[in-house]
């Protein structure tokens, strides 16, 4: 599956907010002007962004945050729309329940991209079974563990140390000494951090 491999900071500048693609603990705000579009001096425009443009930008932002491409994102939205309740909230819950995201939220990877790589390289088990599909949906009660051979990887140890200092989400329980965590429950909307306006995405797909 094709993925963006260019400068991560450029994507955050394009969206005007830190997407935390380089680190979950260190903001880019001190390193670059997030309110300035990519380009030598930042692209400017006097034209007002249309409603469609605003909705499209929000969708692009969420896709980049979670590292999901268009076709897969559409499938997530279709599933969210089929489920009972708020479609936008359902969408975010599906994205947050991805295995790569849960590995990231538990602090085993410093970014979602790094967490995705750990999953793809078979460094992760779910309930004792090796899992290598980043998009696998994690269920309440599932136990996520780092495989024995990967526990000494410096990047995992460092990421977990930083995550412990910053605090874990309330919907995961992590035993750092065991390199293991439990997905306690699907997070409620209030538990999902991030500058996201999911209603704009619902409006976009409802056109």
From Swiss-Prot:
Keywords: Ribonucleoprotein, Ribosomal protein, RNA-binding, rRNA-binding. Residues 31-55 are annotated as: Disordered. Belongs to the universal ribosomal protein uS4 family. GO terms for biological process: ribosomal small subunit biogenesis; translation. InterPro entries: Ribosomal_uS4, Ribosomal_uS4_bac-type, Ribosomal_uS4_CS, Ribosomal_uS4_N, S4_RNA-bd, S4_RNA-bd_sf. This is Small ribosomal subunit protein uS4. The keyword DNA repair does not apply. Pfam families: Ribosomal_S4, S4. HAMAP family: Ribosomal_uS4_B (MF_01306_B). The lineage of its organism: Bacteria, Pseudomonadati, Pseudomonadota, Betaproteobacteria, Burkholderiales. One of the primary rRNA binding proteins, it binds directly to 16S rRNA where it nucleates assembly of the body of the 30S subunit. With S5 and S12 plays an important role in translational accuracy. It comes from Burkholderia thailandensis (strain ATCC 700388 / DSM 13276 / CCUG 48851 / CIP 106301 / E264). Part of the 30S ribosomal subunit. Contacts protein S5. The interaction surface between S4 and S5 is involved in control of translational fidelity. One of its GO terms (cellular component) is small ribosomal subunit. Residues 97-160 form the S4 RNA-binding domain. Disulfide bonds: none annotated. One of its GO terms (molecular function) is rRNA binding. Signal peptide: none annotated. Residues 42-53 have a biased composition (Polar residues).
